[in-house]
Amino acid sequence: MPQTISRVFLIVLDSVGIGELPDAARYGDEGSSTLGNLAREIPLRLPTLRSLGLDQLVSLGGANTIPPVGAYGRLAERSPGKDSVTGHWELMGIVLEQPFPTFPSGFPPEVIAEFERRIGRGSLGNVVASGTEIIDRLGPLHMETGKPIVYTSADSVFQIAAHEEVIPVPELYRMCEAAFEQVGKGMGVGRVIARPFVGQPGSFKRTANRHDYALDPMGETLLDVLTRHSLPVLAIGKVQDLFAGRGIAQAVHTGSDAEGMDAIDAACRSVTSGLDFANLVDFDVHYRSEEHTSEFQSH
């Protein structure tokens, strides 16, 4: 008789890829292969992932002596765009016909002016930037003026960074809610993200108080189907935010991948049915640049 599967663990290693997609040139990603390129610099052991078949898909360096015991394969995204919302939605069954809007030159002046009117103060930035770079560059001016830092990326995001001692986290969240009403619900931008940080100039550090505001999924997802059939969904990490909380019975927000793995371990011991959907984001948040190769490997 076929075996019945009562629970599934779906774990996303955020930004950990094994090769470019056919549309890579559209995003300047030709030749990308996070694990493949890393393995050319530092051979990767990864015994568990090897046993599940990962090195049948990408060379991890060293000898392959572990026969695969799991099913393995590559996924290719059908939706246009490459942001977190698009990818996670597609994993749950929603294929977008049009990408979320992006702003490679920053947001139009009238959008920023309206945002500033809504929050009652000016803002800094309005550029495409990495989060760590822009708080290093504009953080001191932000601390002097009290103006939040606004930036975007290649993704459809409106990100607001603020020092927790300058703009308290609840106030930053209120700013993000105002921005989400304007650019999310009003313009279709995929996410508004609160990016609080602490520290002094030269040693700023982003905190675990990040919060994502995402659009409601544009159609029924697998999460909705599972919920309708009384199969509980546990969301770990930023997953709840990416689906605007829809179809999720319980959520565990985490401040690090260590906390995420602890939550997964706890679910292994206590959850008997349904879907446990986790995102481990530290690879993307902390280790995505070339100078962090060894940290990425050890993580």
What is the meaning of each model-derived region?
Residues 291-298:
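Conserved small/polar residues in nucleotide/adenosyl-binding loops
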Residues 233-245, 272-288:
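A glycine-rich, aromatic-flanked flexible loop/lid motif
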Residues 3-5, 15-163, 167-170, 195, ...:
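Active-site nucleophile/metal-coordination loop of metallo-enzymes that catalyze phosphate/sulfate
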Residues 235-264:
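Functional beta-strand-loop-alpha-helix junction segments that form "active/interaction loops"
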Residues 1-5, 138-140, 175-184, 221-228, ...:
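Short amphipathic alpha-helices and their capping/turn segments at secondary-structure boundaries
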Residues 162-163, 170-237:
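Extended, H/D-rich, highly charged conserved domains that either
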Residues 146-149, 190-192, 264-284:
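Active-site regions of oxyanion-processing enzymes, predominantly non-cytosolic
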Residues 9-18, 294:
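Metal-dependent active-site segment of extracytoplasmic phospho-/sulfohydrolases and closely related
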